[in-house]
């Protein structure tokens, strides 16, 4: 592994595994280098304008592709709590998001996404969400 590959991995780690195209450009990658990294499978396109490294957990990719991050019981499991999750992935999206509804997902709509990181809500927020979760609720608050 060369120095640039190590720096690249470190850069992704500091961004919790998910990096915007504009962040890669600021890091020194141009569009051609990003395209080449993707073609050589050194980068995984998560959705338009977002990238991850190969080997990123599929549960995180599913949440990000739906436009959110892990929430509720999915975030609790991510934070190391042993739970029976069932088949539904719980994600948090901003209240104004569109297109996040996907089969097999429970969407938690939020007006504030300040707690946690790009991967998941904080443990505190996940516990609060789980205490109020009604798995069939997938509509934004009115």
Regions found by a protein language model. Name each.
Residues 1-142:
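Short gly/ser-rich loop at a beta-strand->alpha-helix junction or flexible surface loop bordering the NTP-binding
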């Amino acid at each position: 592994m060369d120095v640039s590959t190590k720096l690249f991995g470190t850069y992704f780690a500091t961004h919790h595994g998910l990096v915007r195209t504009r962040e890669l450009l600021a890091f020194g990658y141009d569009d051609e280098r990003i395209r080449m990294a993707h073609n050589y499978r050194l980068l995984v396109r998560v959705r338009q304008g977002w990238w991850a490294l190969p080997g990123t957990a599929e549960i995180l990719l599913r949440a990000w592709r739906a436009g959110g991050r892990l929430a509720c019981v999915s975030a609790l499991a991510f934070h190391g709590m042993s739970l029976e999750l069932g088949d539904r992935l719980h994600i948090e999206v901003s209240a104004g998001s569109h297109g996040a509804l996907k089969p097999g997902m429970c969407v938690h709509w939020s007006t504030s996404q300040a707690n946690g990181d790009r991967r998941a809500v904080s443990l505190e927020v996940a516990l609060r969400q789980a205490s109020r979760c009604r798995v069939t609720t997938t509509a934004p608050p009115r």
